[in-house]
A protein has these predicted regions:
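Hydrophobic alpha-helical core bundles mediating ligand binding, dimerization, or RNAP-core interactions
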Residues: 27-31, 105-116
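N-terminal leader segment of winged-helix/HTH proteins
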Residues: 1-37, 84
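Hydrophobic side chains within alpha-helical segments
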Residues: 45, 79-80
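N-terminal helix-turn-helix DNA-binding core of bacterial DNA-binding proteins
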Residues: 28-70, 92, 96-103
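Alpha-helical residues within the helix-turn-helix
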Residues: 65, 76, 82-83
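Base-recognition residues in the alpha-helical recognition helix of bacterial helix-turn-helix
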Residues: 76-77, 94
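Residues in the helix-turn-helix
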Residues: 73
Length: 118
């Protein structure tokens, strides 16, 4: 259901694939993505990344600085967001730049619609 890989995950999801996805696969995919949002801190990280201009990425340390959490906690939340398909990262020297997976908000919305309609 995704296209475009980086070292730390998928860069973009293909919205057209939802049309041909069966209902059970759709529910499984929706559950996977929902797990990523199952914590208020992860929702805040997604919100921060969503508000960022698409051509600019957060350095992971910027996210740590913006949240009242230890670096290890933020890293754990970013790891879960990557594993569940919300975020990808790219190496930039000694730093990792984080961004939302392209089309992920629309993809999530369409999965919800399809899961409810069928």
């Amino acid at each position: 259901m995704t296209t475009g890989k980086s070292a730390y995950g998928t860069r973009c999801v293909d919205l057209e694939v939802i049309e041909s996805t069966d209902h059970e696969t759709c529910k499984t995919e929706l559950a996977r993505l929902s797990k990523g949002l199952a914590n208020p801190t992860r929702i805040e990280i997604v919100r921060m990344l969503y508000k960022k201009s698409p051509d600019r990425k957060y350095i992971c340390s910027d996210i740590v600085d913006a949240l009242p959490l230890a670096q290890a906690s933020v890293s754990q939340h970013l790891k879960i967001l990557k594993e569940t398909g919300w975020v990808y990262g790219e190496n930039d020297g000694s730093r990792v730049r984080c961004s939302l997976v392209g089309n992920i908000m629309e993809y999530y919305r369409e999965l919800i619609k399809k899961a409810i309609q069928e």
